[in-house]
Design a protein with these regions (language model features):
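N-terminal secretory signal peptides
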Residues: 1-21, 25, 34-35, 40
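Boundary at the C-terminal end of the N-terminal hydrophobic targeting segment
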Residues: 42-44
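Short, locally clustered residues in the helix-turn-helix/winged-helix DNA-binding domain
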Residues: 31
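Structured, non-membrane catalytic/scaffold regions adjacent to prosthetic-group chemistry
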Residues: 46-319
Length: 319
């Protein structure tokens, strides 16, 4: 079936991270004390990360949204990554010394090609693209993020799953020594997620390896994470070390922890409330304290590309 593409956005229309950080430094120099009281941790000086590196050969994508992206600071200091703590700024502070190299990814299960691959070898066969996507958290906040990544559909095709493979399962690194949040039993570690084969081969799904044209920061899931923009953010598993082609629906971390609150599909749906809050509206991070919440779009606005995946499925039961 023909996949319709959303409107493109020129890279020049996004505030560059250098310009943003230079502007932030100027503001801090003049009024850091007052700003800190008003805005909290996001206004604290960002620690330079010497491991940041520009990514070469990145092409633009017709799948990018026409909305302006959040700042680099928004994206890298306001995160859910429970492997490094449960507060929004915990990953930024606690992942600072995490070493994401060397890294390997294991591909196994019902596929003709399997094995364990160095990260660099794993991504080498695939083209890098910038995908500027909306990201909607299940907690009713959102961002727009300029990811750099590789097509998950291309990855699936490369490893040639057999007809037995109905789902793709993902697993995060389990290392409580280096990932301090894993020392607490917040979840049944390691973090696990999954998609149907049809979802994994949809053109919107990517494995992200960067943001704002640079390598992915630790707090955002370095060196490789899943991005499925029509689903709630918790589906975007970070720090991936295993990809498995399986014949049965994989168990997923939040669904195992609280099945009444977090389903397997986790499609953004303003008509299906979380048991403890409405999903009809969302707060855009960085929009300002007095900016009204905005209406949440079905499938986060990507319905033209993905709605057909769920034809005949009761979305109230299969949330």
């Amino acid at each position: 079936m023909l996949i319709k593409k959303p409107a493109d956005i020129r890279t020049s229309e996004i505030t560059s991270q250098d310009n943003y950080l230079n502007r932030r430094a100027f503001i801090r120099a003049g009024s850091i004390a007052g700003a800190s009281m008003l805005a909290g941790p996001a206004f604290s000086a960002m620690v330079p990360d010497k491991r940041r590196a520009k990514l070469a050969g990145v092409s633009s994508s017709d799948f990018s949204t026409d909305e302006a992206a959040n700042s680099y600071e928004d994206i890298t200091t306001y995160n859910n990554y429970y492997e490094f703590g449960t507060a929004k700024d915990d990953p930024y502070h606690n992942a600072t010394d995490f070493e994401s190299r060397p890294w390997s990814v294991t591909v196994d299960g019902h596929a003709d090609k399997t094995g364990t691959f160095h990260f660099e070898d794993f991504i080498k066969p695939f083209d890098l693209e910038e995908r500027i996507y909306r990201m909607r958290c299940v907690e009713a906040w959102s961002m727009v993020i300029p990811w750099v990544g590789i097509s998950l559909a291309d990855v699936v095709k490369h490893y040639q799953p057999t007809s037995q493979a109905k789902y793709v399962a993902f697993e995060t690194l389990h290392d409580p020594v280096r990932m301090s949040g894993q020392r607490r039993r917040v979840l049944d570690w390691p973090y696990r997620e999954g998609l149907t084969i049809a979802e994994a081969t949809n053109p919107l799904a990517i494995l992200a390896v960067g943001v704002y044209g640079e390598t992915l920061p630790n707090q955002n899931g370095a060196p490789i994470r899943l991005v499925v923009p029509w689903k709630y953010g918790f589906k975007g598993i970070k720090g991936i070390v295993r990809i498995s082609f399986v014949d049965k629906k994989p168990r997923t971390s939040w669904n195992m922890a609280t099945p009444r609150e977090y389903g397997f599909y986790a499609n953004v749906n303003p008509e299906v409330s979380h048991p403890r809050w409405s999903q009809a509206r969302e707060r855009r991070i960085g929009a300002g304290l007095f900016t009204p919440k905005q209406a949440t779009l079905m499938y986060n606005g990507y319905g033209e590309q993905v709605a057909h995946l769920y034809d005949g499925l009761d979305l109230h039961k299969n949330f």
